[in-house]
């Protein structure tokens, strides 16, 4: 059902007991571990649930090796979980678009080219408060975390020299770019959250995907029109 209708009833009836469904239908898709319920963490927990703790690492390694054979290039010294995270944050969306012929069932909300914040929302779980929840439970807390890390890096830069200072400045500058991008995204997200947008599955992905301005990735590829920019 659209609008997340019936989901609570399914859970109450005992659905998803073995592996609980995500409680808000918002899955952060990040290149680093900023949230404990991001897509990478959920995949890890799914593998643990299905195959057990004793086989967790070998299965993660199998997944990572498969991804390096067919989707992404291997990276020396990278852990299996980091390889999976890299695939998810750089290639999953492209593969999903291709698989569903530009009519995705998971929608990618994206702050922009710096990827300060990205998340997937399953279209059947979306409802008119999803954007407000995305903002209050993910975007606003992430802004605070970015700022705290920038402040910490500034302090470290003051006490560093040479190559270490250069590295710290680079990390700080990259994080500052993400912070600024996320702040702009937050302004736009607040605007659309206040509108409490509903979708009608009968209208199809093409129509519904175009209701969110430039909050979503690849709007023109999916709808045929450039996104409305605030």
Mark where each language-model region is.
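Terminal accessory regions of large proteins
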Residues: 1-230
């Amino acid at each position: 059902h659209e609008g997340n209708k019936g989901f609570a009833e399914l859970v109450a009836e005992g659905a998803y007991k073995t592996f609980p469904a995500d409680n808000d239908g918002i899955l952060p898709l990040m290149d680093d571990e900023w949230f404990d319920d991001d897509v990478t963490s959920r995949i890890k927990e799914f593998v643990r649930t299905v195959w057990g703790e004793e086989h967790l690492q070998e299965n993660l390694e199998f997944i990572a090796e498969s991804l390096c054979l067919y989707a992404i290039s291997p990276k020396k010294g990278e852990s299996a979980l980091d390889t999976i995270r890299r695939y998810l944050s750089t290639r999953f969306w492209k593969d999903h678009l291709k698989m569903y012929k530009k009519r995705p069932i998971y929608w990618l909300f994206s702050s922009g080219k710096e990827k300060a914040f990205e998340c997937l929302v399953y279209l059947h779980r979306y409802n008119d408060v999803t954007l407000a929840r995305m903002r209050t439970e993910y975007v606003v807390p992430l802004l605070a975390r970015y700022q705290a890390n920038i402040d910490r890096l500034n302090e470290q830069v003051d006490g560093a020299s040479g190559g270490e200072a250069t590295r710290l400045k680079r990390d700080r500058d990259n994080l500052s770019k993400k912070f600024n991008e996320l702040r702009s995204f937050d302004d736009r997200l607040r605007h659309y959250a206040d509108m409490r947008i509903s979708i009608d599955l009968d209208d199809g992905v093409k129509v519904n995907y175009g209701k969110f301005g430039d909050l979503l990735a690849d709007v023109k590829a999916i709808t045929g029109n450039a996104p409305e920019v605030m």
